[in-house]
Design a protein with these regions (language model features):
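The feature captures the beta-strand-to-loop junction immediately N-terminal to the Walker
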Residues: 33-35
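Helix-to-loop junction immediately C-terminal to a conserved catalytic motif
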Residues: 48
């Protein structure tokens, strides 16, 4: 659908993107993971044809775009930025705006607005103005506005940065439905690994201006010895704690939010890949629960969220032996 060839993009003398080849196929779900400032937003703007690369070419459906062709291609690609701007008027007016620009009017426009609002859960917001919306609601409205216009390609910049869990699930369901029904192509940029796993089949890392496929080494910047048989390295991506385990068969990545870790005081009974033994390093109480920092025997520090009752019942004090059990869904094997 969209392809970058021999692209180098600069701001002043600084090269922010160096991409010999990158393709976003029709119907794909691609995630770009990188730290803040890595160039994710710039990459999305190139894919949206809102910026031209300093060097190289952007192809749409196999053809270089220029002149009037840029406008035609742009109408089929929609970018929802991290801090979207809503127009004056109500949420309903915003959802209808893109349709009017495409010549969709009357009953057809009302059906499209109602459908997009229902899918993103913004029906109760249709009569509100921008000043009456939270940041998370603004993001949902912006995505609903994009989907109402029926793009072939949807580009999302940090789509869950201001959303609660219910909104994230609604967005995920809406995108899956659009993809199943009409082959929507989705590319999202995020520094949250859990977003990438939830919404994509193809995860790329962006660092030093270059895209790479996901591996433990290039995602978490850890160096693992070639002869390693067992071991753990630690890293953090956004709010997610990461343990990278190695064994004789390869690498297992545990992408584990603190709420997906169970802590027990029982001795480690098995050598399951989703368990680590350790000792409590410190307890930091954060209402309504407690954040329990456990330093595992193998040297990786992870954070679990448990209740105050569990802290008392398990006698979770520094030095207490504990076992970490990760939810099976949190274990990703490469």
């Amino acid at each position: 659908m969209i392809e970058l060839r021999d692209v180098r993009h600069r701001y002043g003398r600084r090269v922010v993107l160096d991409l010999p080849a990158f393709a976003l196929p029709a119907g794909a779900r691609v995630a770009i993971v990188g730290h803040n400032g890595a160039g994710k937003s710039t990459l999305l703007r190139l894919l949206a044809l809102l910026e031209a690369p300093t060097e190289g070419a952007v192809l749409f459906e196999g053809h270089a775009v220029a002149g009037r062709a840029i406008g035609r291609a742009r109408r089929r690609v929609t970018l929802v930025e991290q801090r979207p701007i809503l127009l004056r008027g109500t949420v309903r007016d915003n959802l209808a705006y893109g349709l009017a620009a495409r010549g969709v009017r009357g009953a057809a426009r009302e059906r499209a607005v109602a459908g997009a609002a229902e899918r993103l859960g913004v029906v109760p917001l249709l009569g509100r103005g921008r000043a009456e919306l939270s940041d998370g609601e603004v993001q949902r409205v912006a995505v609903a506005r994009a989907l109402a216009a029926g793009p072939d390609v949807l580009l999302l910049d940090e789509p869950a940065s201001s959303a609660d869990r219910a909104a994230v699930l609604a967005l995920h369901d809406a995108l899956e439905r659009e993809r199943a029904e009409r082959g929507l192509t989705v590319c999202l940029a995020s520094h949250q690994l859990e977003d990438a796993y939830r919404w994509s089949d193809d995860i790329r890392t962006l660092a030093d201006g270059r895209l790479s496929p996901v591996t433990p080494e290039n995602l978490f910047r850890v160096s693992l010895p070639a002869d390693a048989t067992e071991g753990v390295k630690h890293a953090r991506v956004g709010r997610t704690e990461i343990a990278v385990l190695t064994d004789r068969t390869g690498h297992a990545i545990l992408a584990v939010p603190p709420t997906d870790i169970l802590v027990s005081a029982a001795p480690l009974a098995t050598s399951a890949r989703n368990q680590l033994s350790g000792h409590v390093a410190r307890v930091a109480r954060i209402r309504p629960g407690a954040g329990v920092h456990v330093t595992a025997d193998v040297g990786v520090e992870l954070t679990a969220m448990v209740t105050e009752e569990a802290v008392r019942e398990l006698a979770l004090v520094p030095g207490r032996p504990v076992v970490y059990t990760f939810k099976a869904s949190a274990v990703r094997v490469f």
